[in-house]
Amino acid sequence: MDQRTIGFIGSGRVTAFMIEGLFRAHTNLAITVMDANPAVSENLAQRITSVTNAGTNSKNVGKADFLFIALPPPNVQAGCESIAPFVGQHTIVVSLAPKASISALSNWLGTDKIARYIPNAATSIGEGYNPVAWGSSISESDRKLVRELLSVLGDMPEVDETNLETYAVLSAMGPTYLWPLLDEMITSGVRYGLTPDESARLVSRMAVASANMIEAPGKDYATRMDMIPSKPMADIEQDLRGLFRAKLDAIHAKLSN
């Protein structure tokens, strides 16, 4: 891939793991970041020394080959309107934010070359599950450029825009549902006598293999559970499911309205 310029408006956690993943796979990127709080973008540029900090200067960020909107939903409109005068005619905009539709982004930015992309943290190691939805006016050649840049970050299913908030709840936020449980298992392993490395390896391998079984032929939930004779959590499973379901429903409703 020829050298590409990339701008990020917003320099928080998502920007950081996106850049980490991009630099793992691409060596010819010129990345500039900006943030309404210049201390945030400066901190990121100090941690990732290949990144240029534009502070609050929108001009260079807006004219990049790829402009990533990496802002929390309440800040997206203001951020887009602030950078709109500087967006280049060639610039492809990729929004990482839930809630803000392609139609709204187009109105705020004054461009139709827009895609929405929902990354998750595994993007940082090239194993993300990151759906993309295309604006109706983005050309196939521009879509190819986006795929070329982002496919190295993990799976990139092309989905209907109306489903992106569901992906945000289940994929982007999904690790935060699992990691506390897995971390508690690792801690328990150490408490029972394993070394931290032994316990982490055990739990990691167990979790990966268990996840792989979800898509294995003939291994639906009931079949998988029936394979294990001892089920220590059976007496609280329905309570846990109820709490979990209520939380997921609340998050999804918040993002979808």
Where is each model-derived feature located?
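NAD(P)+-binding Rossmann beta1-loop-alpha1 motif at the extreme N-terminus of oxidoreductases
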Residues: 1-61, 128, 188-192, 251-257
